[in-house]
């Protein structure tokens, strides 16, 4: 419950007996983790409102679901936990509404990639309310009401709060240790705090994002485990250092796998990085072999240096393999064009002779050599303002009906010659 830096002791409270005592240390490792954000909203103390962070929290939610047999639930927050919670509740036959303050789910993705996740979750029956803020909760005899500003309140049987976490750094702060980004515990590359005899690792420790070079909070299990090893090594006199994290992550969302590494467009733009992007939609393995599915890959790289900044992949099969290859390439200093030379395993059930990662490298090389000039969806807005531009969609009528950009005229490619007069 407390650290006495001068005496090099910690105060310990036994949870079973409430007894307290002091324990001395030579070296101390802090791994307090993170705590869920609980906003000060009306109705937060309702027994129908749950937060999810620990294993014990899952037991409480599962017990409540088993006992109360809820038919409806509201999930507040569209990060990892919120999306996973929505899927698991839906698997129990519960109708789920997911409310997210931002205009998209999963902030590690760019909006175009997140839209693929939105469409898939909607197809699974999840109602998404994006760009909406929760104002509070009210208990009713028929359940709990979630108030969303001026919007219609939502009546449900339970509410799951998963709006993010904060580093649990109060113990460190009370001991006078220096804090860093978002009140995380500041550490060096040996995981030492401002007191060299005290180390900090995990979700409460400030680290360097290896793709951006900026200080960051990365609440992922992989980095936390590596930090623990670095701290233990340093205590034992082994001179290893932590190299930072690219925040590589992977997430199951119903039938999709969503993965990312490095930074996204939003972060690159905010940092003033001059970047290029590639979007491709290859098949997970050889197209002539049954069972292949399309994945969408987005690769960001620095325009001048060709340094890979990050990648995002959404698909059904083979997504984790490709994101790991790109994450490894980033750490090894391989450039975007260098992806074309990677010698990756191939057999028709697993990949294609030109692996999707190789294809991204080919595209980067084509851009660098001036063989291709890219045109992105967001560039359409500028074209709409030009009088001499006709926006033409040459897909089939069925493809056009499934979805099209506003302002595009549909003339199928096979009919284009006979209908040229319509373009005057």
Language-model regions, residue ranges each:
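A Rossmann-like FAD-binding core segment of flavoenzymes
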Residues: 1-12, 16, 23, 91-189
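Hydrophobic beta-strand scaffold positions of dinucleotide-using enzymes
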Residues: 29, 160, 172, 391-393
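Mid-to-C-terminal Rossmann-like scaffold of FAD/NAD(P)H-dependent oxidoreductases
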Residues: 204-317, 351-352, 356-385, 389
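Positively charged, proline/Ser/Thr-rich regional signature most characteristic
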Residues: 379-424
